Amino acid sequence: MLKILQLILLLFGAVFGSCVRAESVLFLNPGSTQEAFWVSYSQFMQAAARDLGIDLQILYAQRQPELTLAQARLALQGPSRPDYLVFVNEQYVAPQIMRMAYNSGVKLFIVNAALTPNQQALVGERADRIGSLVPNDEEGGYLMMKELIRLHPAVAPGDTIELLAFSGLKITPSSQLREKGMQRALAEHPQVRLRQLVYGGWKQQRAYEQARQLLVRYPDVSLVWAANDEMAFGAMRAFTEAGKVPGKDVLFSAVNTSPAALQAVVDGRLSALLGGHFTLGGWALVELHDYEQGVDLNQYGGRDRQVPLLQLIDKKHAQQMLDMGASPDYGVHFRKLSAKGRPASYRYPFNLQTLMH
């Protein structure tokens, strides 16, 4: 760990010590460099930074919250500090990071998972916290479950549809909210029976191993709800090995717009796909750039906002996103989204439609 900390410190010196741009931003990416979602998330941020003239640095924590905290400590208490720190409240690390940031001179912005009510009460109002942008995770889980049920053939009165669910981590806000949305949809459809919900840790191999065991116990399952694409593919592999045909014998759902997930929608192997939240970091940079130029974010939708980014992606849109995917910025002109000089009625167009122009 000491070697890792020394390496991070050297990196900070190289990055921020020579910074000549008006604003420097460090993003603490909680994910892995092997995860398609978090890589695409970073790529979209980098595209935004280039267009906006922001000096952006990204550090990955490789799914280790203790590494996120170590990175934050060096950024906030070291000699070369960024102007802004963007981070995720993954595994509820935000209060610790905010304590480190006290009197550091670094401004904070939270993405993807904001402060919980209890955390907000704990840290109170802070002038250094600029704002937050989070997706509609609860609604996303609900929409995905509703779409699966809609696509499933109707059953006779008294018969049931059997479901397996793969959630992420118990201590991840996005996982909890998507799960909550799924349960809300199930309450509206008593004919669907949730056989078991397991935590796949967002990982394909773990979901595969879990699905193999669950299939023996519940051979009549015909719906699989998964909180991300990796777990959906792991479960799909287990069902395929058992002789089940994805999209016919069993309907699968997932979240994330990885190329593999988009292709699975086009091929019919994934029946319901939600995505769009990989853009949150890029949108956050638009707001930070506006803030740097004196824009009052409260006048343009508020500083803490939930954005309805998670939307159902059909075959047409999946193919369109695949065709556009070679360009990580999706052709977005980030500067044109600025609220500077616009009337108070203006709202940032942070949605999938902005990518589908």
Name these PLM-found stretches:
Residues R99-E139, A261-L262:
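Flexible loop/hinge segments that line or gate small-molecule binding clefts
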Residues T68, G131-I161, A207, T257, ...:
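Hydrophobic alpha-helical segments within soluble ligand-binding/sensing domains
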Residues A36-L52, G140-E147, P173-V192, Q210, ...:
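Short, solvent-exposed amphipathic alpha-helices that sit
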Residues L108-Q120, W225-L270, T279:
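Venus flytrap/periplasmic-binding-protein-like
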Residues F166-K170, W283-H357:
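Hinge/cleft segment of the Venus flytrap/periplasmic-binding protein
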Residues S24-F44, A48, Q57-Q71, N89-Y92, ...:
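Extracytoplasmic "Venus flytrap"
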Residues L28, P79-N89, K107-N112, L164-A165, ...:
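Periplasmic-binding protein-like
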Residues L67-D83, Y92, Y208-D220:
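Short, well-structured alpha-helical segments in soluble
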